[in-house]
Amino acid sequence: MASWLQIPKNSPFSLANIPFGIISSSKLSSRVPAIAIGDYALDLSKFASSGGFSQLPVIQPHLNVFNQSTLNAFAALGRPVHRQVREYIQKVFSTETPFPQILRDNAALQKEALLPLSEVTNHLPMQIGDYTDFYAGLNHAYNVGVLFRGPDNALQPNYKHLPVAYHGRASSVVTSGTPLHRPQGQILTNPAANPKLPTFSPCKKLDIELELAFFVSTPNDLGHPVHIDKAEDHIFGVVLMNDWSARDIQAWEYVPLGPFNAKNFGTTITPWVVLIDALEPFRTVGLEPGNRESLLPYLREKRADTAYDIPLEVEVTNAGGEPTVISHSNAKNLLYSFPQMLAHHTITGCNLNTGDLLGSGTISGKENQTEGSFLEQTNGKNPIKLADGSERLFLEDGDTVILRGMAGTEGNYVGFGDCAGTILPPVQLDL
């Protein structure tokens, strides 16, 4: 796809993408919806109020969605509308645009609505009512299971029959670039001791989890599950996600009800939501086909290619140091698809709402340096060497982690942008 707007060939926001987000700037009096294209954000509030959507009848009754401070109202319009809006914007920016008067030849509107990304502030794209994190990364689940239970019992008996998940904390989901303080809590420093007595301490095993996550668009009613064949139409779009994890706090607290404080202190997502339609060209078979016979019928999809071939990477930079890419993985390293996660979540009659966030689970490969967490790479014993010669078993204060994901070819990349966060020292407590 070629555009009249100059777009860097390595941009994750090519004309093939058109992700949606929420921005503010010194030019704007409030937060507004926008799309990212190349090095620019298109202010959809200004674009809509200036006749930008005049050639798209389907959105005319709903132009007020572009005056909201979140994308929830737009997401609730449903996938057919999202698709038409995205395709329309692609036509507006294409070299052979059928609507040159809208923006290409409209210098005044370009000046008003096209803002350099370097001059805008990104915000959470959605008001998130609930957040659920799945555990669909089979390789990660196996690797961690081996560490704790050995290879013979690495996976629980239910793992290949249902997408395991836990309910996370929506209030501490933050957008890329938000720093997080090192968490503090109860830690068992001597697991062999009897009796087992915890101490209160800053986390000493602070970790990351490389994930994708998706937002719910249209809700389902309480008591009415979403059929697997219709589940994808309830998905608005996808973001990169870092599920920060305090492994030592987790080890002491997680039996019998799972993680709590170990994961509730911060979850970072990318600010630009990549619509599910933009990922369609990258469909592939995941770790197992989506239509495999071993699944119960409510989870069995009609097609095999229910995953996405999206290269992912993890970069770590220590304070004042050089960046080091410590891992390369791929989004296809998942056992369950997004529709399967959504169908399973609702099978009991649970109602999902517009803006709910559902994480994939940690996406790890099978080889060394394809793991999506420090726990898998180091096991707390085998340090990762950074570019400046320093070593890491887990994250230290001042470390910055950036997750990236981008599919496609030069000039037509579909990516998420950076999912970045820096670790600050723990807050001083008066205990």
Swiss-Prot record:
Keyword Transmembrane helix attached: no
UniProt-annotated binding residues for Ca(2+): 133, 209, 211, 243
Keywords recorded for this protein, A-Z: Calcium, Hydrolase, Magnesium, Metal-binding, Phenylalanine catabolism, Tyrosine catabolism
EC number: 3.7.1.2
GO BP annotation list: homogentisate catabolic process; L-phenylalanine catabolic process; tyrosine catabolic process
Residues annotated to bind Mg(2+): 243, 263, 267
Active site residues according to the UniProt entry: 140
Note: Disruption of the fahA gene results in phenylalanine toxicity, secretion of succinylacetone and the absence of growth. This is analogous to the genetic disease, type I hereditary tyrosinemia in humans.
Function in brief: Use of phenylalanine and phenylacetate as a carbon source.
Protein name from the UniProt record: Fumarylacetoacetase
Organism: Emericella nidulans (strain FGSC A4 / ATCC 38163 / CBS 112.46 / NRRL 194 / M139) (Aspergillus nidulans)
Lineage: Eukaryota, Fungi, Dikarya, Ascomycota, Pezizomycotina
